[in-house]
Amino acid sequence: MDPEVFAQARLRMDQLTKPPRALGYLEEVALRLAALQGRVKPELGRGAVVVAAADHGVVAEGVSAYPQEVTRQMVLNFLRGGAAINQFALAADCAVYVLDVGVVGELPDHPGLLKRKVRPGTANLAQGPAMTPEEAERALLAGREAARRAIAEGATLLAAGDMGIGNTTAAAALTAALLGLPPEAVVGRGTGVGEEGLRRKRQAVARALARLHPGMGPLEVAAEVGGLELVAIAGIYLEGYEAGLPLVLDGFPVTAGALLAWKMAPGLRDHLFAGHLSREPGHRHQLEALGLRPLLDLDLALGEGTGAVLAMPLLRAAARILHMATFQEAGVSRG
């Protein structure tokens, strides 16, 4: 963030042909974009979303309404262009990349797929560590690699998406661990489990959290209770942060990955924009911890990066605010 550019952009904002604060929160977004890009008139072009996919051993606890094979089936759907994220990305001028870091089963070669499978799904986090520290490191590097590709191919703003049956359980455990919250605050219904499924999710998260001990680093915590795609998402955002890009958050699992990235690099928070507020109850706690206001509140609970991609045109519009004429430039009298 460039404080001098922020001040210059604020001065220009106060002179634009509109009443003060008439564009509300979008004005703050515009100022942040200007400071991030180091220019008073920010420009946002094509976006990119990297959908990180992996399976979860914790599905053995009965925490999901869908069977594990849906993860692989949905990845194939992404590659064929048939998912919600594909359709929203077409509308939002956003490229879609898919990253396999732990899907059970083989996937075909595809130009939009980066195969970096660390292992075929995590171990059951309710019974023991989800992965080894070395596996967590590999997942992190895979996310970084996918982000580098997206940036090299022209992304000017970057989002992550997620796919993994059982991943709201892992996201809840990771969020609770990183923010010091009880399971009840962060465990939601995910894909739509009933009361018994919700109880099992809370128990699984509680058992995972009980194994943690003081002094563990963020990546150690993620290896114990997280998911391969959640760690990869942290890598995606870390790489985007180091490249200086605006970073758009999706829902609960993606924001869990972003929390991990933030714990590893606190300066990353200045680059984050909350695309939306998810239906998952833990998402509000995540955004509050990051100090972020969501751009959209549409009762979404799909994942895939959909909420982040829906917000991209809004971010582009916010950037254009500072391209408006000032009262002096337009020859308009001030009130």
Curated annotation (Swiss-Prot):
Catalytic activity field: 5,6-dimethylbenzimidazole + nicotinate beta-D-ribonucleotide = alpha-ribazole 5'-phosphate + nicotinate + H(+)
Top-rank taxon: Bacteria
GO molecular function: nicotinate-nucleotide-dimethylbenzimidazole phosphoribosyltransferase activity
Pfam families on file: DBI_PRT
EC code(s) of this entry: 2.4.2.21
Function: Catalyzes the synthesis of alpha-ribazole-5'-phosphate from nicotinate mononucleotide (NAMN) and 5,6-dimethylbenzimidazole (DMB).
Family to which the UniProt record says this protein belongs: Belongs to the CobT family.
Protein name: Nicotinate-nucleotide--dimethylbenzimidazole phosphoribosyltransferase
